[in-house]
A protein has these predicted regions:
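Glycine-rich, often proline-containing surface loops adjacent to acidic residues and nearby aromatics
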Residues: 1-11, 93-96, 121-130
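TerminUS-proximal long segments
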Residues: 117-173
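Residue-level marker of positions within ordered structural domains that often coincide
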Residues: 28, 102, 154
């Protein structure tokens, strides 16, 4: 039994819960705009990130050297978005967006808002949480980030968007 790591700072846990709850709401709105196969908004306990993924229904090329779980997770073409607390190559809380497989030209795509950038070590777009926190319209800024990544990847990869997206007037929260 782990008795050494059982303490925590309640203030930080409560702040994290408030942030992740808000992010879940925005991710759910983004999720509602898609009628193709998608994951629910879900929390990865291993990497401690909240994510939502859209699939286009096509098989992806196999990932050489990938373990079983990774092979299964990326068996079909997808565009994924998430939020994590940071660590490794990004030392601050941030949102991310990527396409698997990554279509040609994706690295050069324009992501919104202007604080978003392509992280060459992670092969994904990153938007610092601080940029969203300071935004005049945080929900709009986050939805713009997610939509801009999705549109860039889906267009470059020739997804059949008209078959996968809910008409704007029918978006459901």
């Amino acid at each position: 039994e782990d008795t050494r790591h059982k303490s925590y700072e309640a203030e930080y846990v409560e702040r994290f819960h408030a942030i992740i709850s808000w992010v879940h709401g925005v991710f759910s709105e983004f999720h509602s705009r898609f009628i193709g196969k998608s994951s629910p908004v879900h929390f990865f306990w291993g990497s401690f990130d909240l994510a939502v993924t859209r699939f286009n229904g096509e098989k992806a090329p196999p990932r050489n050297g990938a373990d079983y779980i990774t092979r299964e997770a990326y068996s079909h073409k997808n565009i994924s978005h998430g939020f994590w607390c940071g660590g490794g190559a990004v030392l601050e809380p941030a949102f991310y967006g990527y396409s698997a497989p990554e279509p040609d030209g994706f690295k050069q795509a324009i992501a919104l808002p202007s604080e978003a950038f392509y992280h060459k070590d992670l092969n994904e777009f990153v938007l610092p949480y601080e940029a969203i926190r300071k935004s005049d319209s945080p929900e709009k800024a986050l939805l713009d980030f997610m939509q801009s990544i999705y549109e860039a990847a889906a267009n470059l990869a020739d997804w059949k968007r008209e078959e996968l997206e809910r008409p704007k007037a029918q978006a459901v929260s």
